[in-house]
Amino acid sequence: MKRIKTALVSVFHKDGLDELLKKLNDEGVRFLSTGGTQQFIEGLGYECQKVEDLTTYPSILGGRVKTLHPKVFGGILARRDNEGDREQMAQYDIPEIDLVIVDLYPFEQTVAMADCKSAITEQDIIEKIDIGGISLIRAAAKNFNDVVIVPSKAEYPVLLDILNRNGAQTTIEERRMFATKAFGVSSHYDTAIHQWFSKS
């Protein structure tokens, strides 16, 4: 069993998140987030460190670059049982991130709105291609040995059930299960983007 101590939360849809955040907070899990998600967490009364404070780098390019930083991805990808990784984490002051919760930009829904002849433009659709979120999903899923990845709001109740049973601890089998779901989400998302570009 591995304990969840720090959670990075970066979601588009906030509905259904509050119950999960409450349980994590009750278990003493520390939150790390950006933008609207950070404001949502703080609005619930929980402390939340800004990713910008961790990286000492602001969100740039109209929000296109927020979490893409070695201090974030190093904290997710670092192998906890690898001495070299641990030495570099200490050298560069990289915190361990044990849980990543992501809900991607609604690309397919935006395309569907455009297909219904709404005022959605091609640029609107392109801006809904998630970069940071999909990168977080893949990084956390790759390191499922140490990290829990919740890749969509559909998985919020799954993690909540585990937390209610075990506290802030997960098994390797549970982390692998989440990783499998995560690569499914990633594959589906990229397939939708490929299909749209193929039709454009």
Question: Model-flagged regions — what are they?
Answer:
Residues 1-54:
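N-terminal glycine-/serine-/threonine-rich phosphate-binding loop
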Residues 2-5, 94-200:
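Internal alpha/beta core interface subdomains
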Residues 3-7, 70-77, 121-122:
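Short, basic, glycine/proline-bearing loop/turn elements
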Residues 9, 30-35, 49-53, 78, ...:
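General beta-strand structural signal in soluble alpha/beta enzymes
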Residues 16-17, 84, 134-136:
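Short glycine/serine/threonine-rich phosphate/pyrophosphate-binding segments
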Residues 30-31, 57, 127-128:
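Short, flexible coil/turn micro-motifs enriched in small/turn-prone residues
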Residues 36-107:
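Glycine-rich nucleotide/cofactor/substrate-binding loop typically near the N-terminus or early
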